[in-house]
């Protein structure tokens, strides 16, 4: 199967530039994501807007690859699986936060890279040096500590939220692993297209999860 990534990617360290770019982009996204909800626009509807904004990005991605969409079975299976794991995990996270404490939910979910690391070392036979292992062992607890939210007086009942949080932890870890696995089987542009498609398909579920009995900011300041 043709490898769509450049053979010189690892040697030139371009992957590090992309990883840092992703970290920066997701960091900005994480800093801004709570603003619409604080302005009265529910997170579930925020998901719907987010999924729709992926459409022009998917179009630009396909255009950059001369409109070549991978249609073989591995492409749409991996692409759809990655999309459902990511977007579905986000919807489950909303439900976990409704009944569970954020100061426990977020540290659990934030450790999902552990799943990706274990699967990559075990199934993909990737090698990690002693220095890599030191970095991993320092990074994982750091992620959990940075994700910690101070407890409040919210009454906690039952453990459904805990199973939901563990589900998100597992889904996002698997998503990152399958993204790595799929990168050798399909172009990243096609992968993003299928991720967009599955994200949009989950919009009706996000809408049904919305509590419309509460006041919603439908003005431009809400979804914007």
Spans of model-derived segments:
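Loop-to-transmembrane-helix transition segments
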Residues: 14-22, 67-92, 160-168, 214-224
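C-terminal ends of transmembrane helices
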Residues: 4-7, 58-70, 114-130, 174-185
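Hydrophobic alpha-helical transmembrane segments of multi-pass integral membrane proteins
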Residues: 13-18, 41-63, 77, 138-141, ...
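Structural motif at transmembrane-helix junctions in multi-pass transporters
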Residues: 38-45, 91-108, 184-190
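Membrane-interface helix termini and inter-helical loops of multi-pass transporters
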Residues: 30-43, 67-69, 95-99, 147-158, ...
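Specific alpha-helical transmembrane segments that line the substrate/conduction pathway
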Residues: 48-52, 97-124
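Hydrophobic/small/kink-forming positions within alpha-helical transmembrane segments
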Residues: 23, 27, 31, 59, ...
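Juxtamembrane helix-loop boundary signature in multi-pass membrane transporters
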Residues: 1-21, 114-170
């Amino acid at each position: 199967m043709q490898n769509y990534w450049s053979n010189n990617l690892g040697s030139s360290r371009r992957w590090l530039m992309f990883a840092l770019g992703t970290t920066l982009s997701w960091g900005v996204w994480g800093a801004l994501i709570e603003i619409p909800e604080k302005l009265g626009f529910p997170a579930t509807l925020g998901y719907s807007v987010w999924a729709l904004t992926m459409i022009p990005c998917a179009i630009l991605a396909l255009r950059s690859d001369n409109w070549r969409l991978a249609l073989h079975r591995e492409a749409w299976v991996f692409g759809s699986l990655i999309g459902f794991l990511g977007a579905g995990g986000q919807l489950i996270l909303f439900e976990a936060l409704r009944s569970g404490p954020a100061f426990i939910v977020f540290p659990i979910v934030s450790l999902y890279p552990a799943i990706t690391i274990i699967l990559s070392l075990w199934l993909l036979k990737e090698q990690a040096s002693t220095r890599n292992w030191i970095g991993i062992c320092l990074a994982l607890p750091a992620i959990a500590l940075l994700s910690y939210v101070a407890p409040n007086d919210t009454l906690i009942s039952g453990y459904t939220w805990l199973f939901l949080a563990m589900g998100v932890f597992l889904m996002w870890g698997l998503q990152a692993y399958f993204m790595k696995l799929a990168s050798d089987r399909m172009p990243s542009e096609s992968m993003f297209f299928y991720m967009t498609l599955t994200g949009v398909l989950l919009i009706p579920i996000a809408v049904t999860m919305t509590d419309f009995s509460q006041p919603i900011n439908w003005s431009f300041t809400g979804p914007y």
